[in-house]
Amino acid sequence: MSIQPKVIALGFFDGVHLGHGALLRRTVEEAKRRGVRSAVFTWAQPPKEVVTGVPVPLINSPEDRAWLAKSLYDIDDVIMVPFNKEMMTTSWEDFVTEILIKRYHAVHLVAGHDHRFGHKNQGTPELLKSTCAELGLGCDIIPEVTVGGITVSSTYIRRLVSLGQVERAMEYLGHPHILTQTVRHGRRIGHTIGIPTVNLVPPPHVLVPGDGVYIARVCLMDGSSYAAVTNVGTRPTVNNGSDLTVESWMLDFDGDLYGQSIRVEFYKRLRDEIRFDSLDALKAEIRRNADDARAYFASKA
């Protein structure tokens, strides 16, 4: 990590939604004004999960959180720190002075109106602002962001995504819900019916949209992207098992992506996952869904 001075945004940033965006824009703005680096300080895992031992479903993996902060908001550095016993027992004062200032060279801090930090969450935005003033650091506390009268929050967005309401979730995220994972081998049934797919198994405790068929875009690591029809679920027509998969038919793509990482962006839910009477019926419906996907992206061009 660079020893250069930094303006640091504080938070967990799950989803990197519009509320987080207000923090990140202010962070980059202040960093440019000072001629220093912009950074995010965040935890690799939810503190609540570590404290309680109960897994917390997340909108994004740590890697996707970092990618979104950098790609959407031009953050220079993402400081991703394990939430361990040392961090759990660090007082809020030491968190500011020993970690943010001495270890990561903060000269200005940016936090949300409801941010809590330090042992037992005893640090508050008010304490952060007064402490920064005493230490000669800059500090901004960012108010809540609302859309349509609803406060933008990761909790609300998690609910929308889990219900499959990805189009509505996008209003609060400011970008499509994404999932990045390595392509795995499937049963190649799609190839036999002329609809080859790429298959992902979602990482543990990362939210995928509710079961159904979606208009999506698949992005490759070389920067190219393709409109897609993506099925989330257990593929009842061809599979008697219960394993959840994310299966995408990339339109106008011909290639082998096995073993490569791809990013799936979810734009709109088309329908429920359905058990069809035959593969021909399944094929015909997927092709109709592909027409819907082409029309959707053409309307956005």
Which sequence ranges carry the predicted segments?
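N-terminal catalytic cores of NTP/NDP-binding nucleotidyl/phosphoryl-transfer enzymes
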Residues: 2-61
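Residue-level signal for inorganic ion chemistry
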Residues: 17, 69, 109, 169, ...
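A structural preference for short, hydrophobic beta-strand core positions in alpha/beta folds
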Residues: 40, 80, 141-142
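N-terminal Rossmann-like or analogous alpha/beta NTP/dinucleotide-binding catalytic cores
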Residues: 47-135
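Glycine-rich, Lys/Arg-enriched anion-binding loops that position phosphate/diphosphate groups
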Residues: 132-234
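Phosphate/ribose-recognition catalytic cores of enzymes acting on nucleotide-derived substrates
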Residues: 186-301
